[in-house]
Amino acid sequence: MGEKPWQPLLQSFEKLSNCVQTHLSNFIGIKNTPPSSQSTIQNPIISLDSSPPIATNSSSLQKLPLKDKSTGPVTKEDLGRATWTFLHTLAAQYPEKPTRQQKKDVKELMTILSRMYPCRECADHFKEILRSNPAQAGSQEEFSQWLCHVHNTVNRSLGKLVFPCERVDARWGKLECEQKSCDLHGTSMDF
């Protein structure tokens, strides 16, 4: 065995870290620019390399707006919005012909959410909805439509407007991923 048997695993982890750093930089609006005299060197989150760390422009970090986000605890509304965004995005990426395991995973996820959701009142309501309307995950369309109807059930109980489920794909369509890397086809460590 080589001098560093963990090297391949750590290299994969470094690739993942770099990918996450790149996506976060893109998300918050930092451009990846080559180092200049105005840049300050900052340590990367993870590095296996002994070469100098990536340089970023500290002035660009200081000028980022906070986008009207409070610094207090997450509200029920924020949590709900984030959860629905995640679930609808998951449904949009769900395969048209899921495996038995994928169908089982969706149903388990819904059950786990109904037990572990941080808002107890919301979790109990979701549990009631699941009892009368179990998760449907036979295809991408079926899962997306089921989720839309469940979301509308929650919205009605909150006195909110309902969403026209025939427009669910237009609202929550596939992510824009290179080479369809976002599609649910199993697990991979290739980044």
Curated annotation (Swiss-Prot):
Principal EC category: oxidoreductase
Listed Pfam families: Evr1_Alr
Keywords: Disulfide bond, FAD, Flavoprotein, Mitochondrion, Oxidoreductase
Reactions catalysed, as given in the entry: 2 R'C(R)SH + O2 = R'C(R)S-S(R)CR' + H2O2
Entry EC number(s): 1.8.3.2
Gene3D superfamilies, per the entry: ERV/ALR sulfhydryl oxidase domain
Residues covered by the ERV/ALR sulfhydryl oxidase domain: 72-172
GO MF, one annotated term: identical protein binding
Disulfide bonds: C119-C122, C148-C165, C177-C182
Record's GO cellular component terms: mitochondrion
PTM annotation: Contains three disulfide bonds; one catalytic disulfide (Cys-119 to Cys-122), one structural disulfide (Cys-148 to Cys-165), and one shuttle disulfide (Cys-177 to Cys-182).
Keyword set includes Metal-binding: no
SUPFAM superfamilies in the cross-refs: FAD-dependent thiol oxidase
Subcellular location: Mitochondrion
Role summary: FAD-dependent sulfhydryl oxidase that catalyzes disulfide bond formation. Oxidizes thioredoxin in vitro. Required for the import and folding of small cysteine-containing proteins in the mitochondrial intermembrane space, and can act independently of the oxidoreductase MIA40. Can oxidize the cytochrome c oxidase assembly protein COX19, a typical substrate of MIA40.
Description of how the protein assembles with itself and partners: Homodimer.
Protein name: FAD-linked sulfhydryl oxidase ERV1
Organism field: Arabidopsis thaliana
Lineage of the organism: Eukaryota, Viridiplantae, Streptophyta, Embryophyta, Tracheophyta
Gene: ERV1
